[in-house]
Regions:
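Short secondary-structure boundary/capping segments
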Residues: 85-87, 222, 270
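NTP-dependent nucleotidyl-transfer catalytic core
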Residues: 1-212, 216-217, 263, 278-348
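Internal helical hairpin/lid segments
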Residues: 227-296
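Domain-scale selection of a single, long terminal region
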Residues: 178, 193, 222, 232-234, ...
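Active-site and channel-lining beta-strand-loop segments
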Residues: 204-233, 237-238
Length: 348
């Protein structure tokens, strides 16, 4: 596989941004096995965005010859009060996350935050060195990476450790590529600003599209981040443990206004999930409604929907059919005992 083919794999949807493209091309030319990571909090049930779309993107990196790691941030999970801040539950759910990503991305490496900190004695020394380059105000502004805002009344001191820890994780893993959803962009830009000052390796940042929730968007100010599928809201997305019937019901109820393409969750799912895995999508409908039609790319599908050549009910049925094909095999192989299921559900 040549450099262009590798680049195209990394750049294909759901990738939304590469910082920078020229640096990535140079990396692919000069490094036969670049090191990648994506860091994840261990919180609620895995869903279409957090596991499947993310996992598909990781597989693109792997196909391009990249050495990929999923970093399960157990300490960050504790800091951010996820799973009730219970360490035993966090540890158990970490195993569930590891099993899930190994299932979807068989060749990925799994690293726990606690394992990294235990094995790297210089971590906290490097952490202090990094924080000397951060002001309190800048730290507060980066809290959006953990779903917080700088204006929240109750921000405990531990939460201020989260952004610099995430940055030092990147250095400690000696990464060439940092990968995340668009909601993590601030920390990656901070890394690219501060690392050169410290003479640390500066990674390329690759950000993928965050799948929107299934309800109508309530805020359009930043469609790249707001309204994403949430692990804490069972109605907002498709979860890997949803039954075929639950998937079908959720898609039928999803917001999908006729002719409206902006922030349309079903068009986003089609583009970033369905067309990632299927070369063509067949819409089955009676002859009186135009008959069957096959789409080979998301642009044509979106164009027909915009022009009202494709009705929302037909799009919903099609998305439901193909999602079931993707989710069902994962659900059948990914076991989750009742005790752990209830623990996650309780803390959601």
């Amino acid at each position: 596989m040549d450099v262009t083919e590798k680049f195209d794999l990394i750049a294909k949807p759901p990738t939304e941004e590469i910082v920078t493209k020229d640096e990535l091309i140079e990396l692919l030319k000069t490094n036969s096995k670049p090191k990648h990571y994506i860091g994840l909090e261990i919180s609620g049930f895995l869903h279409l965005g957090s596991l499947i779309s993310t996992g598909f993107k990781i597989n693109d990196f792997i196909k391009a010859g990249i050495d990929c790691t999923v970093f399960l941030a157990d300490w960050h999970t504790l800091i951010n009060d996820k799973l009730g801040g219970d360490w035993e539950t966090i540890s158990k759910v970490s195993k569930y996350y590891a099993d899930a990503f190994k299932l979807v991305c068989p060749r990925v490496k799994i690293v726990l935050g606690s394992e990294l900190y235990d094995s790297k004695k210089e971590y906290w020394f490097e952490f202090i060195k990094f924080t000397k380059h951060m002001s309190l105000a800048r730290t507060m502004r980066t809290l959006t990476i953990m779903g917080r805002t700088e204006n929240e009344e109750k921000i405990d001191l531990a939460k201020l450790l989260y952004p610099p820890m995430q940055a030092v994780d990147i250095h400690s893993l000696d990464l060439d590529i940092v990968h995340a959803g668009m909601d993590q962009r601030k920390i990656h830009m901070l890394v690219r600003e501060i690392f050169p000052k410290m003479k640390w390796k500066v990674p390329i940042a690759v950000h993928h599209k965050l799948l929107p929730g299934l309800s109508e968007p309530s805020d359009y100010t930043d469609s790249k981040i707001l309204g994403k599928m949430s692990k804490s809201d069972s109605k907002s997305g498709i979860f890997v443990h949803d039954t075929d019937k639950e998937i079908s019901t959720k898609i039928k109820k999803a917001w999908c206004e006729e002719g409206h393409v902006e922030n349309n969750p079903l068009l986003e799912i089609s583009k970033h999930v369905l067309f990632h895995e299927f070369n063509e999508i067949l819409v089955e409908r009676p002859e009186k409604f135009g008959g069957n039609v096959t789409y080979t790319n998301s642009s044509t599908l979106e164009s027909d929907f915009l022009q009202k050549k494709l009705h929302p009910s037909d799009l919903k049925q099609t998305v439901s059919n193909y999602l079931i094909k993707i989710v069902s095999p994962i659900r059948e192989k990914l076991t989750l005992n009742e005790e752990l299921f209830q623990a996650i559900k309780k803390s959601a």
